[in-house]
From Swiss-Prot:
PANTHER family: ZINC FINGER PROTEIN 512 (PTHR22979:SF2), ZINC FINGER PROTEIN-RELATED (PTHR22979). GO terms for cellular component: nucleus. Gene3D superfamilies: Classic Zinc Finger (3.30.160.60). SUPFAM superfamilies: beta-beta-alpha zinc fingers (SSF57667). Keywords: DNA-binding, Isopeptide bond, Metal-binding, Nucleus, Repeat, Transcription, Transcription regulation, Ubl conjugation, Zinc, Zinc-finger. It comes from Bos taurus. Residues 119-130, 495-508, 556-567 have a biased composition (Basic residues). The gene is ZNF512. It is found in: Nucleus. May be involved in transcriptional regulation. A zinc finger (C2H2-type) spans 197-220, 287-310, 406-430, 440-463. This is Zinc finger protein 512. There is a cross-link at residues 18, 84, 227, 333 (Glycyl lysine isopeptide (Lys-Gly) (interchain with G-Cter in SUMO2)). Residues 485-494, 523-544 have a biased composition (Basic and acidic residues).
Length: 567
């Protein structure tokens, strides 16, 4: 550059004193001096004001005493001397192109980023955002599948038309299985049998294997096929019945002539033992009470009767006790202690809680009703119900499927029911029809009831002590019975004490003579106290104890206040 502009070239080494002095003189003559300091990595321009002296402007451009001219000044030093960093934007780069600032090469930035990860974001000014991925679903178009082409007049075409029309096609071999696709139908036809499936228990024939499995589970309780000499294990049988009960909600009797169904395993097993047997066989199965001879057809009924009526004493001798009652022996403990009344009440409440837990486990199951003995059915009479033909029943069932309700067929009656059984019960008591039904009658007290639920509630509440089953309705009657027994025992104790007192008064000894003089008040109090102590002591003794003869009794004279005189 020319000396007229006052530009001073930056030298790598220290400048001599004369050269520095000449530059100061040239810079003082110019109104505005432009000073450029070059370095290997940075370049900037310093503007000067006219008010500043030449010495001050020159001192800002020249290097410090021993440091080279290419020394890079700090930003704090530039701010203190009113040097703007934006002035560097007017300086041309090494290639002659003006740039805002010289950036570091890529290699140095990578090294800085390794040491300081946040530095890279500061250099670029903002974080790098991930590129938005295009949605593949938006680009792809939905291609509608063309209907498969089948030969004209073929079976596949007929099946396809039937699927389009009805939604499914049935198997031409068994006519019991339907499929929604032709591939599924072909796969089924490979395994489909033309022969019918036959039930091994009742001989009924069905077309599908699934129908046969349901038939065996519903009608035969999934009874396995037994060979000659094989027996059913009791735990496995209970597990099998439990699975059937969970799936269907009830257990049906397997006899063809019996249509009974049960909602508990215990009730079902109790029914199976007696179903189909004659009166003679049932008579042999009865269990009679050893004390009163009352017959019971279940162990639980006899056990409850013995606990409530005869107490926890042994009801059979050791040698004559039958095998069926050995497992429920109610003898006293090894110590010989008889069960207390409070323990009996506790056992009763425990049984009540256990029955409540069973009812919670299966809400629809009538556990207590299944345990009722057979003679309970004879405690009340049922009136005759009207009979209906199969056509009428089929019509009612179809009406329920269509309209979900049935109306009473009698003229003038607007009763509506959602089940056939409800309509049957209503027709037995409907007064607008031609059928005249009787009433339910209790055989224990000859009381009549309109509904079956009424007579059952009456038997459970009034005649509850006759049953071994503990129902929630019998709780109050049982508590009353226990209170009455407790009062009777207390009255008997009072009567015994009264009798003992009367006997003591009669047994007063005639040899005791009272003094002629009237005793003082203190003597009378002592006599009364001694007399009361004597009564209490005798009342504590057993009333059956024999009285002591008078000749062995010691005669005690009453105490007096008179002092013995000297003879």
């Amino acid at each position: 550059m020319s000396s007229r502009l006052g530009a001073v070239p930056a030298t790598p080494g220290p400048t001599p004193f004369k050269q520095q002095r000449s530059t100061r003189i040239v810079g003082a003559k110019n109104s505005r001096t432009q000073c450029s300091i070059k370095d290997n990595s940075f370049q900037y321009t310093i503007p000067h004001d006219d008010s500043l002296s030449g010495s001050s402007s020159a001192s800002s451009c020249e290097p410090v005493s021993d440091f080279p001219a290419s020394f890079r000044k700090s930003t704090y030093w530039m701010k203190m001397r009113r040097i703007k960093s934006a002035a560097a934007s007017h300086v041309e780069g090494p290639g002659g192109v003006s740039t805002k600032g010289k950036r570091k090469p890529r290699q140095e930035e990578d090294e800085d980023y390794r040491e300081f990860p946040q530095k890279k974001h500061k250099l670029y000014g903002r974080k790098q955002r991930p590129k938005a991925q295009p949605n593949p679903k938006a680009q792809t178009r939905r291609i509608r599948k063309e209907p498969p082409a089948y030969a004209a007049g073929s079976l596949e075409e007929q099946w396809y038309l039937e699927i389009v029309d009805k939604g499914s096609v049935s198997c031409p071999t068994c006519q019991a299985v339907g499929r929604k696709t032709i591939e599924g139908l072909k796969k089924h036809m490979e395994n489909c049998k033309q022969e019918m499936f036959t039930c091994h228990h009742c001989g009924k024939q069905l077309r599908s294997l699934a129908g046969m499995k349901y038939h065996v589970m519903a009608n035969h309780n999934s009874l396995p096929i037994l060979k000659a000499g094989d027996e059913i294990d009791e735990p496995s049988e209970r597990e099998r019945l439990r699975t059937v009960l969970k799936r269907l909600g009830k257990l049906r009797c397997m006899r063809e002539s019996c249509s009974s169904s049960f909602t508990s395993i215990m009730g079902y097993l109790y029914h199976v033992r007696k179903c189909g047997k004659g009166a003679a066989e049932l008579e042999k199965m009865t269990l009679k009470c050893h004390h009163c001879g009352k017959p019971y057809r279940s162990k639980a009924g006899l056990a409850y009767h013995l606990r409530s009526e005869h107490g926890p004493i042994s009801f059979f001798p050791e040698s004559g006790q039958p095998e069926c009652l050995k497992d429920m022996s109610l003898e006293s403990k090894s110590g010989g202690r008889v069960q207390r009344r409070s323990a009996k009440i506790a056992v009763y409440h425990l049984q009540e809680l256990a029955s409540a837990e069973l009812a919670k486990e299966w809400p629809k199951r009538k556990v207590l009703q299944d345990l009722v003995p057979d003679d309970r059915k004879l405690k009340y009479t049922r009136p005759g119900l009207p009979t209906f033909s199969q056509e009428v029943l089929h019509k009612w069932k179809s009406d329920i499927k269509k309209y979900h309700r049935i109306q009473c067929p009698n003229q003038g009656c607007e009763a509506v029911y959602s089940s056939v059984s409800g309509l049957k019960a209503h027709l037995g008591s409907c007064t607008l029809g031609t059928f005249v039904a009787g009433k339910y009658k209790c055989l224990l007290c000859q009381k009549e009831f309109v509904s079956e639920s009424g007579v059952k509630y009456h038997i459970n509440s009034v005649h509850a002590e006759d049953w071994f089953v503990v129902n929630p309705t019998t709780t109050k009657s049982f508590e009353k019975l226990m209170k009455i027994k407790q009062r009777q025992q207390e009255e008997e104790k009072r009567r015994q004490q009264h009798r003992s007192r009367r006997s003591l008064r009669r047994r007063q000894q005639p040899g005791i003579e009272l003094p002629e003089t009237e005793p003082s008040l203190r003597v009378g109090k002592d006599q009364r106290r001694n007399h009361e102590e004597l009564l209490v002591a005798t009342s504590r003794k057993e009333p059956e104890q024999e009285p002591v003869p008078t000749q062995f009794q010691k005669v005690r004279s009453p105490k007096t206040n008179h002092k013995r005189g000297k003879k």
